[in-house]
């Protein structure tokens, strides 16, 4: 393979190099002064005579031009009233991810809203009606985030939390893991409510047999499958024990196939 010929520096190369160096240094200085962000490590400024080939020089010119281009949001910044600085690229990414999470949550609520929910062994309305009486997050265990507003971010730690949370929640596996954790947490809640109660032990074993997505729908549709029923200090022992028997009755119906779990895998 033939080697690329060594570059011959022309006057127009010198002029373009000087212009790009000037613009690059000005960009670095301006960003440091206005936003406190040091971009020195983001772009090299080699001596002109260090380029061995025209290809090397052209590649650097592209990098320098991109670095100083106002359309490159990676190197454009905003500073809010709390002194938090972020690149416009990061702000736009969090906004996109937030919108995607909102879309996913809306889809999930739409898929479940017409399902009946039960209390005391009887249908009491739809999940949508239950949500209207409380909130989507209370019923579904899924929080719908508000629109991202950078002007309200008070600290860098809050910005990182929002960035990481929204990115994580765009992954479909997030919701699968959440269903698994919800089931485990509920089982622990039942376990922590009794020292010795045969029916509770039976309930725990039955709950462990249920696939997480089935459990999630049962959690949505059966009011007795609720953390409040077991964690509330106001509940008497008799009430909690009675709730165990109610849930066991529901699970017997579940095993017989009396519940249409059409949200499975949604």
From Swiss-Prot:
A motif (Nuclear localization signal) lies at residues 25-34. It is found in: Virion; Host nucleus. Residues 173-266 are annotated as: Priming. Changing residue 232 to T: Complete loss of priming activity. It holds the Pfam family Phi-29_GP3. Residues 74-172 are annotated as: Intermediate. Keywords: Coiled coil, Covalent protein-DNA linkage, Degradation of host cell envelope components during virus entry, Degradation of host peptidoglycans during virus entry, DNA replication, DNA-binding, Early protein, Host nucleus, Hydrolase, Phosphoprotein, Viral DNA replication, Viral genome packaging, Viral release from host cell, Virion, Virus entry into host cell. GO terms for molecular function: DNA binding; hydrolase activity. Residues 1-73 are annotated as: Disordered. Changing residue 256 to M: 90% loss of primer activity. Belongs to the phi29likevirus DNA terminal protein family. Interacts with the viral polymerase; this interaction allows the initiation of TP-primed DNA replication at both viral DNA ends. Binds to ssDNA. Interacts with the replication protein p1. Part of a DNA-gp3-gp16 complex. This is Primer terminal protein. The gene is 3.
